[in-house]
Amino acid sequence: MRFQYCPHCGRKAEMRQVGDEGVIPYCAVCEVPLWDLFTTSIIAAVVNEYDEIALLRQDYVSTTNHVCVAGVMKPGESAEETVVREISEELGLRVKSLQYIKSYPYEKKEMLMLGFQAVVDKQEFILSGEVDAAEWVRFEDALPLLREGSIAWQLVKAVTG
């Protein structure tokens, strides 16, 4: 989110060169730069001991492609805690180990998605109401089920080679 007005005093922001950061919104009254804001979220490639990945169907996200577990961080929650919570909520699975993979800017939704690989034991899913379906997919079969170039596709490609 780019500030149009100062959140402290309400004055209209002006564009000003701020050091090496470039031209950004600035409040001349409060004398503060108004840094752009974005939502921090996670996306997780959930894998098991059989070289399979959990892919979800969430019709509110896409009616044509599978997706990965994803969610927004809550205040006071670390990225790792968010991954564990989201996997538990969406799939009913317990995470054994986590590895940070990469961050993915998602400008369309003003988000920064932190990508992780989460290792779990293979078991049946207990789906939340926001997940329409989920399945275990062999690594080599996963990419064609995702929208090519999407953040989920990029993460799965990084994790599965």
Describe each region flagged by the PLM.
Residues 1-61, 72-124, 161:
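N-terminal leader/linker segments that precede catalytic domains of diphosphate-processing enzymes
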Residues 1-2, 14, 63-66, 107-109, ...:
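Nudix hydrolase/Nudix homology domain
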